[in-house]
Amino acid sequence: MLPENNTLSIRSYEVKKFLCPMGLKYQKIHACPNNCVLYRDEFASLKACPTCGFSRFKKKIDGNSGDEDKDGPPAKVMWYLPIIPRFKWLFSIKEDPKNLKWHVDGRKCDNLLRHPANSSQWKKIDETFLEFGAEPINLRLGLATYGMNPYGNLSNKHTSWSILLMIYNLSPLLCMKRKYMMLSMMISSPRQPENEIDVYLKPLIDDLKLLWEEGINVYDSYSQESFCLRATLFCTINDFPAYENLSGYSVNGHFACPICEKNMSYIQLKHD
């Protein structure tokens, strides 16, 4: 994200002072504790969930006004780090636009699967969407998500779900480096989002749809010209339970395998 030999301060306040003027801000979005809706767009002004009726805010008692309830902090919050300003910033660093064309200019084509660019899925996208595939700078993104306990113990009283984006245009040496792995969203609460994770993904999906359907105007510091940047979600990376949450495909029962589906063979364990 920063030019070579530049580092950020270890103090959070100093980092915010440096990043926010670049447009690299985050959005703090209120959410229903029951994972029904995000309080944005048409729900931005509501004080209770339109689906379950649960209050948007925690209630607190003001000691100066008897027992009158006052709106406290939000009952649940998620953090969204908009991806479009970060992609624009990526193209402002001279070497990065060149690196993003590696899959065309630097990849070895010998029918061996060394990189996602060698896969049949990558080739299928190029053949199906000719205009998109003709521009090597267009982004192919991977989305990864996983729940974790931020306190490092076995307690299930709090979980955090992070949503990461990887850029597969880059070479294997670069695409898994921390610099190019973008934290786009953090969902933190006592309850896991489970199958309602799609509610929280809405801001990210809106940006991805814009990048796919219309594109955004970006200045390429390497070629020193502006162009229309587009992107596609190439794949998702997750464990099997999270696969069900993201795709809606049931991973339980006889047809749990998403590859075999009804053609899967199975053996009942003797003592199961």
Name each model-derived stretch:
Residues 9-272:
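Domain-level cores of phosphate- or acyl-group-handling catalytic modules
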Residues 1-10:
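Amphipathic alpha-helical blocks
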